[in-house]
A protein has these predicted regions:
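Register position in tetratricopeptide repeats
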Residues: 44, 81, 115, 132, ...
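Extracytoplasmic/luminal low-complexity segments enriched in Pro/Gly and acidic/polar residues
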Residues: 139-167
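Residue-level recognition of tetratricopeptide repeat
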Residues: 3, 40, 77, 111-114, ...
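Amphipathic alpha-helices of TPR/Sel1-like and other helical repeat/solenoid scaffolds
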Residues: 13-25
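Inward-facing hydrophobic residues that define packing positions of alpha-helical scaffold repeats
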Residues: 18, 55, 92-93, 126, ...
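TPR/TPR-like (Sel1-like) alpha-helical repeat modules
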Residues: 117-138
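Alpha-helical adaptor scaffolds
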Residues: 6-11, 26-32, 36-104, 118
Length: 167
């Protein structure tokens, strides 16, 4: 792939070839991967509208349930980057019943709430994500930074996760 942004012809060729792959192999996982590649390239170039379009294309290609969750959380992040907060949070609301995705969904919700300046709500979302990971005996060291950003100590983290409020 051409990553040199000065080489516009090569980038155009890559775009065309990846789109061709999507069109000709739509029923395969390769098409989903190709749409995700185009979405990443769009984000890298600052074109959030194109990234949103490609993420929606990836969803239309019927990826596996696990991949669909990742695509939806990426879509929520792209929408939030474009300050489309209600739409971003609505996507996460649609994933609320997916217990396997609960930690990721809660973390992304916290990130979006932080972008909106809603520190308390973000703290609750991060605490919910942390608690869901703890139930699985998994750790996410990045939460230490996120909790620090919202002013939570380890003891406060546990109490926020146990307060029974949904993020």
């Amino acid at each position: 792939l051409a990553v040199n942004t000065e080489d516009k012809a090569a980038n155009t060729d890559v775009q065309r070839l990846v789109q061709q792959l999507i069109n000709e192999y739509a029923s395969t996982p390769y098409a989903v991967d190709a749409a995700l590649l185009l979405a990443k390239r769009a984000v890298d170039s600052g074109d959030l509208a194109a990234a949103e379009k490609q993420l929606r294309v990836a969803l239309e290609l019927k990826p596996s349930a696990e991949i669909a969750v990742l695509i939806q959380t990426r879509l929520a992040r792209v929408l939030a980057a474009g300050k489309q907060y209600p739409a971003a949070l609505a996507i996460l609301d649609d994933l609320a019943g997916d217990t396997a995705a609960a930690p990721l969904v809660a973390e992304v919700r916290g990130d979006i709430l932080m972008l909106q300046g809603q520190r308390d709500a973000a703290a609750k979302a991060y605490a919910a994500a942390d608690a869901a990971l703890a139930e699985r005996d998994e750790a996410r060291p990045v939460f230490d930074l996120k909790f620090s950003d919202v002013g939570l100590t380890p003891a406060k983290r546990a109490s926020d996760a146990d307060d029974g409020e949904a993020p």
